[in-house]
Design a protein with these regions (language model features):
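Membrane-lumen/periplasm interface segments of multi-pass, membrane-embedded glycan/lipid transferases
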Residues: 3-6, 19-26, 44-66, 104-126, ...
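Hydrophobic, aromatic-rich transmembrane alpha-helices
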Residues: 65-79, 128-142, 197, 323-326, ...
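Transmembrane alpha-helix segments characteristic
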Residues: 91-98, 153-161, 228-239, 348, ...
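Signature aromatic-anchored transmembrane alpha helix within multi-pass, membrane-resident enzymes
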Residues: 223-228, 441-445, 449, 571, ...
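Transmembrane-helix motifs of polytopic, lipid-linked glycan transferases
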Residues: 314-336, 373, 377
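Transmembrane-helix signature of polytopic, membrane-embedded enzymes
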Residues: 325-352, 368-369, 386-392, 396, ...
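Perimembrane helix-loop-helix junctions
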Residues: 377-391, 413-448, 452
Length: 806
C-alpha cells in the first residue's frame, strides 16, 4: 500500500508541474501581459483627490515612466533574462519620479523627499512603471533579436505626443481642447477597434475578401493613372478650399508680407525705397528701415511672384501639393514597395493638414515639395549603379535642397543634414556615388548663392537675414529672451515639442485615431529598422528638436513647423498597419488592416463633429465675412477711380503701427502695448509724435511715460473717445496692403492706394494724395452689420493730435 501511495505521489508530480508550467506560460503570454499593462495604466485614474494638480502629477509621471524606460531598455538587453523586468521596472519608476522633480524645479517648485514618497506621486509612478514594464515585456522589446531604436522612438513619441505633457506644463488653454479630443479618441477609436476585432473574429472570410479586393484593386490601377489621378484630386481639393473657405486672400502676417515682397520682385526689384510715409503702410514681418521688403528669405516670395505673373498666386501652393504626391510615391515605392507607396499617397490626399495648409500662401508648402523631390532622388541615388544616374539624381537633390534653403533655410539645413549623414555612410561602397556628391554640393550652392546675393542687396550682408534686421540676436535658436521679452527655457521647449505632436495627432488625420499613436503602434512591433526607417525617424526627430529650440510657437492650420517633415509622418502612419499585420496573425492581423482605413473614412464621414475634416470646412465657411474680404471686388463694386482708401483698424492695431513708425522695435512695441494702460500708451505716442526727429532715447522716454501714468486716474475724454471709436466699426489692413500697386519709381500708386487710418494724422497725405478721392473702409452703417463699409472720407470725424474731434 505504501508503495502504491508512493507511486501515486510520484505520478502526480509531473501533472502538478505541467499545470504550473501552463499557468506560467499563460501569465507570460503577450495578451495577458498587455491586459495587465492596461489595468496598471488605468489605476492612477482611481485617485480622484487632488484636483488639477494631481492630474498634472499623473501626466508627468506617465511621461517620465515612458522616458525612463528608454535607458533601462538599453541596459536590460545586456542582462540575463530574469533581471530584465526588474531593470525595466526600476528605470520606469525612477524616470517618473525624476520627471516630476525636474519639471517642478523648472517651474519654481522645490519638492522634498516626503513629496516623492507621498501617495499622489508614488502610486502613479509605481502603476505607470509597472504598465510600461509589462507592455515592453509583452512586446519582447528586450529580446536579442529586437532593435532598441524603434522601441525607444515609440516610447519617446508616446511620452510627449500621446501623453499630454504640454497640457500638464503649459499655462494656456491647450488642456481644454485635448481633454475633448482624448474623449473622442477613446470613444471613437475604441469603438472602431472593437468593430474591427468583432468583424475579424466573426466574419474572417468576408474581411479577408474585403481587404484582398481593396488591396488588389488599388494595385491593379496603372501606376501613372493612380499617382497623377491622386495629384489632380489634391490640386482640385486644395484649390476649392482656397476659393470657398478663404476667398483666395491671405490670413496671417506671414502670407501678407510674402505677397507684398512677391509684388516687389514682379517689378524687377529686390526691395523698394522706404515710403515717405511709412506709418501708413505698417505691416508685421515687413521691414521699412533703409529699404522696404519682407523679413522672409527671397525664395518664398519668388514662388508667389511666378503665380502673380500669371494672375494665379492663390494656385501656387495647391499645385505644389499636387506635385508632392508623385515624389512621395516614388520614394515610398523604392523604399517599401508599391503597397505602402499607394497607402501613403491616399493618406496624403486625405490629410486635412496637407490640404488646408496648401490652401494658403505660406512658404512651408514649397519646402514640402522640394523636400519630396530630394527624398525621391535620394532613393534613386541609393539604387544607382551607373555614373549618369548617380550624378543626375545628386544634382536634382542638391538643386532641391538649395532652393529649399532659399525659402526656409532652417528646414533645408535640417533635411540636408539628415540626408547628408545617410549619404556619407553609403558612399564608402561606391566611388561613383562619392564623386556625385561634388555635383550635389555645386548644384545646391547655386540657389544658396542667389539667396546670399539677395541678402547682401537687402540687409547689407550675405549672412544677415531679414529676421535679424527686425529682431536682432533675439531671433536665434536656443535658450534666451525672445524678441518680446519672454525667456525661452528648456521647459518651454519641451512644451512646444509636445504641443506640436499633440496638434499633429489631430491635424494629420482629423479622425478617431490620434496620428502619433498610430505611428507608435507600428514602431512598437517593428523588430528591425531599414535605412529608410532610420531616415524617417531622424527627419522627425531633427525637425521636432530644432523647432522646439526656436522661441516662436508655430501654429497655423496645424503645427506648421512640422509641415516640411510631412512625408516622414505620412509614411510612418502608412507603414503602421502593415507592420502590425506582419507581427500578428488571425483576428489581430485582420483587424490591423481594417482600423486605419475605417478611421480615415469615419473622420471624413463625421459631418456633425467639429473635430473632423468636414467640421473644419464648416468652421472656415462659417467664419466672419471679414476673413474673406476681397479688395479687388470692393474696388470693382464701388467703381473706385483714382482713390485713396483709409482702412480703419482697431485702436490697439493703430497704436502698434504708430510705435513702429517711431522706430520702436517690433518686440518692444508689442511688449509695451500688452502690459500698459491704453491711455498711458496713447499719451506716450502723442508726446513722441510731436518731436519725430528726437529718435535717440525714445524707448526710454516712452517707458518713463508709461511708468509715471496713474492707472487709477480718470481717463481723459480724448482717450475714452479713442477707445470707443472701435465700436463704430473696424477692419483689417492685411488683405489690402499687398493689393497696392507699385509704380516704376518704386512708390505706391495705381488706381487705388490702400493705407492705414491714423485719424487726424491722415492729413499729412493731402500734399501727396490730395488729387485723389478719399474714402474710409471700416465704419458699419448699422450696429450689428457683419461687414465694414466703404464711405466717403469725412474730415470732421478725424481726431486731431490731442485726440479731440474736429
Amino acid at each position: 500500500m505504501a508503495g502504491l501511495a508512493e507511486q501515486g505521489g510520484d505520478a502526480a508530480l509531473p501533472a502538478d508541474a505541467a499545470e504550473r508550467s501552463r499557468l506560467a506560460a499563460l501569465l507570460r503570454s503577450p495578451r495577458v501581459l498587455g491586459t495587465l499593462a492596461l489595468v496598471y495604466a488605468a489605476l492612477p485614474a482611481l485617485l480622484r483627490e487632488g484636483g488639477d494638480g494631481a492630474s498634472r502629477l499623473r501626466t508627468l509621471a506617465a511621461a517620465g515612466a515612458l522616458l525612463g524606460a528608454i535607458p533601462a531598455l538599453a541596459l536590460a538587453r545586456r542582462l540575463a533574462r530574469p533581471l530584465r523586468m526588474a531593470t525595466l521596472l526600476g528605470g520606469s519608476i525612477l524616470g517618473a519620479l525624476l520627471c516630476v522633480t525636474v519639471v517642478a524645479r523648472a517651474m519654481g517648485g522645490a519638492p522634498r523627499m516626503a513629496d516623492l514618497v507621498s501617495l499622489p506621486l508614488l502610486f502613479p509612478a509605481l502603476a505607470f512603471g509597472a504598465a510600461v514594464t509589462l507592455l515592453l515585456t509583452a512586446l519582447g522589446a528586450a529580446d536579442e533579436d529586437r532593435e532598441t531604436l524603434p522601441v525607444a522612438a515609440a516610447l519617446a513619441l508616446s511620452a510627449i505626443g500621446v501623453v499630454p505633457v504640454a497640457s500638464a506644463i503649459g499655462r494656456d488653454s491647450a488642456s481644454g481642447w485635448f481633454v475633448g479630443m482624448t474623449l473622442y479618441w477613446m470613444l471613437g477609436g475604441g469603438t472602431l477597434v472593437l468593430l474591427a476585432l468583432a468583424a475579424s473574429r466573426c466574419l474572417p472570410r468576408h474581411v479577408d475578401r474585403l481587404t484582398s479586393a481593396v488591396g488588389h484593386g488599388a494595385l491593379r490601377i496603372p501606376e501613372r493613372w493612380f499617382v497623377w489621378g491622386a495629384a489632380l484630386l489634391a490640386l482640385l481639393a486644395a484649390a476649392a478650399i482656397t476659393v470657398l473657405c478663404f476667398a483666395r486672400q491671405p490670413h496671417n502676417a506671414d502670407e501678407v508680407a510674402q505677397l507684398w515682397h512677391a509684388r516687389i520682385l514682379l517689378e524687377g526689384r529686390l526691395s523698394l525705397p522706404v515710403d515717405p510715409n511709412p506709418e501708413f503702410f505698417g505691416m508685421d514681418n515687413v521691414i521699412d528701415r533703409g529699404r522696404w521688403y519682407s523679413q522672409f528669405p527671397i525664395g518664398g516670395p519668388a514662388f508667389l511672384a511666378l503665380g502673380l505673373a500669371l494672375r494665379v498666386a492663390w494656385l501656387v501652393n495647391p499645385l505644389l501639393l499636387a506635385l508632392t504626391i508623385p515624389n512621395v510615391h516614388a520614394f515610398a515605392r523604392r523604399a517599401y514597395g508599391s503597397g505602402t507607396a499607394r497607402a501613403a499617397v491616399l493618406l496624403l490626399l486625405a490629410s486635412p493638414f496637407a490640404l488646408f495648409m496648401s490652401a494658403s500662401y505660406m512658404n512651408h508648402v514649397p519646402v514640402l515639395w522640394l523636400v519630396s523631390v530630394a527624398l525621391a532622388q535620394l532613393a534613386v541615388w541609393h539604387e544607382a549603379d551607373d555614373r549618369g544616374t548617380a550624378i543626375r539624381s545628386a544634382a536634382l537633390m542638391g538643386l532641391a535642397l538649395g532652393t529649399a534653403a532659399a525659402v526656409r533655410p532652417l528646414d533645408a539645413a535640417i533635411v540636408a543634414s539628415v540626408m547628408g549623414v545617410m549619404q556619407l555612410t553609403h558612399v564608402r561602397h561606391s566611388a561613383v556615388r562619392a564623386r556625385s556628391l561634388v555635383v550635389q554640393v555645386v548644384a545646391g550652392a547655386m540657389p544658396v548663392g542667389l539667396l546670399l546675393l539677395a541678402n547682401w542687396r537687402t540687409t547689407g550682408a550675405p549672412l544677415r537675414f531679414g529676421y535679424d534686421v527686425l529682431y536682432g540676436s533675439a531671433h536665434q535658436l536656443g535658450f534666451h529672451a525672445d524678441p518680446y521679452g519672454t525667456q525661452h527655457t528648456p521647459l518651454r521647449a519641451l512644451v512646444f515639442a509636445s504641443k506640436y505632436l499633440l496638434e499633429l495627432d489631430v491635424a494629420l488625420l482629423e479622425s478617431p485615431l490620434p496620428a502619433v499613436a498610430v505611428i507608435v503602434a507600428g514602431l512598437f512591433v517593428m523588430r528591425r529598422t531599414s535605412r529608410w526607417d532610420k531616415l524617417l525617424l531622424a527627419l522627425v526627430a531633427a525637425q521636432l528638436v530644432t523647432y522646439a529650440l526656436y522661441w516662436h510657437e508655430g501654429e497655423f492650420r496645424g503645427p506648421r513647423f512640422l509641415y516640411s517633415a510631412l512625408p516622414a509622418f505620412v509614411l510612418l502612419v502608412a507603414r503602421a498597419p502593415f507592420l502590425v499585420a506582419a507581427a500578428t496573425r488571425g483576428t489581430m492581423r485582420r483587424a490591423a488592416l481594417l482600423v486605419l482605413p475605417l478611421a480615415v473614412v469615419a473622420g471624413w464621414s463625421a459631418w456633425t463633429l467639429e473635430a473632423s475634416p468636414v467640421g473644419r470646412l464648416r468652421m472656415y465657411l462659417g467664419a466672419s465675412p471679414m476673413t474673406r474680404l476681397d479688395p479687388a471686388k470692393i474696388e470693382r463694386e464701388a467703381a473706385l477711380r483714382n482713390a485713396l482708401v483709409f482702412v480703419s483698424e482697431s485702436w490697439e492695431a493703430q497704436s502698434l503701427r504708430r510705435l513702429w513708425a517711431l522706430h520702436i522695435d517690433r518686440g518692444d512695441a508689442l511688449r509695451m502695448l500688452a502690459s500698459t494702460h491704453p491711455c498711458a500708451m496713447r499719451q506716450a505716442i502723442l508726446d513722441e509724435e510731436r518731436t519725430p526727429a528726437r529718435q535717440e532715447g525714445r524707448l526710454a522716454r516712452i517707458e518713463a511715460t508709461l511708468k509715471s501714468y496713474d492707472p487709477l486716474a480718470t481717463p481723459s475724454e480724448a482717450c475714452i473717445a479713442d477707445l470707443l471709436s472701435d465700436g463704430e466699426g473696424v477692419a483689417t489692413y492685411a488683405p489690402f496692403f499687398p493689393s497696392n500697386t507699385i509704380e516704376p519709381d518704386g512708390r505706391v500708386g495705381g488706381n487705388v492706394v490702400y493705407v492705414l487710418d491714423l485719424g487726424a494724422h491722415n492729413e499729412v497725405l493731402r500734399t501727396r494724395f490730395g488729387d485723389r478721392a478719399w474714402y474710409r473702409f471700416g465704419p458699419h452703417l448699422r450696429r450689428g452689420d457683419p461687414l465694414p463699409t466703404l464711405t466717403p472720407y469725412d474730415r470732421s470725424g478725424a481726431r486731431d493730435s490731442a485726440g479731440t474731434t474736429r
